């Protein structure tokens, strides 16, 4: 009866111990998940382990990235080899139609490009092997190390949880009265066991990470050596072929190509042209403004002139030009001219009166008579010109002989009768 009760008490204590252990472990997980600050001495004791874990994560990430890069590299090699082969075939096809030296050059270059494309595809073999080895390394070595790391993390969580449990039990411990001494010994024993398990796994993790890094270096050095050897052979063969083509085409006649790079002027030239156009436009605008101002001044001056002067054309009002144009009339209209006396002698027997009657009407000619008379005579226009000339400070001779002026109009109109100028129809009949 006593033995059964003792076993039952031990079972109850073991259940309580497991519950307490799970409680403190869960508390440690919560502290780690929330990022709360832990004991600095405990964290410092795991500094070497944390460094190894960083190396492991770096190896894991770089291996995954290397697999992706090798896949993309293979795709790019296939594409560039295909394009290079197409270019070589095109050059060979065009060389068959061209019998000149250019055709020979295209044929040689096309063969070299096709050969280079085939040799470039040889790089895919070491790359495929590298990809396979890296994938195997990730699936086996890294996965095995990751399993060990996960076990170590669980052991570390239990160990740190046991430390929290022991810290809590030490606060209730009273060595003098032996209170809670048994409980503290149990917790201390639990901490010791969890520490042993954690230290063992910690050592395994550090060794596996070191071995993982070394094995990766050996794998890459072996695989990349094969790739490097293949790549160097490819470039040596390609360079040799291109050198032979260059030597074979050394004596060919070179071709000079001129390419039109730009179809329009540079922005600087366009700016200069626009500036010149604006300058010319401004000069033209200035000239037009000057002409407009001069015209306005002419109109204002013309409005200030007398009415008789405005009745004449503007060109006739200029003194120098008027005298030059009608200088021959001065000799004809002078009182000493012989033509005036001859006209007077002829006119006296015919008209019965001196010809001075014709000239006596001269002062009455003006703008008013021009507007009121029903018959406009050229002599009146001439008299008007004489009056206008007098308005510009020219002497007015009242007894000028008009015969020369009549003869002038007779020459202009041969069919008209010069004797009828200045006489009415009755006077002509009486004559």
Swiss-Prot record:
BP term (GO), one: spermatid development
Domain AH as annotated: residue spans: 44-247
One term of GO molecular function: protein domain specific binding
Biased composition (Basic and acidic residues): 301-316
Region (Disordered) location: 295-316, 351-372
PANTHER family from the UniProt entry: ISLET CELL AUTOANTIGEN 1, ISLET CELL AUTOANTIGEN 1-LIKE PROTEIN
Official protein name in the record: Islet cell autoantigen 1-like protein
Organism: Mus musculus (Mouse)
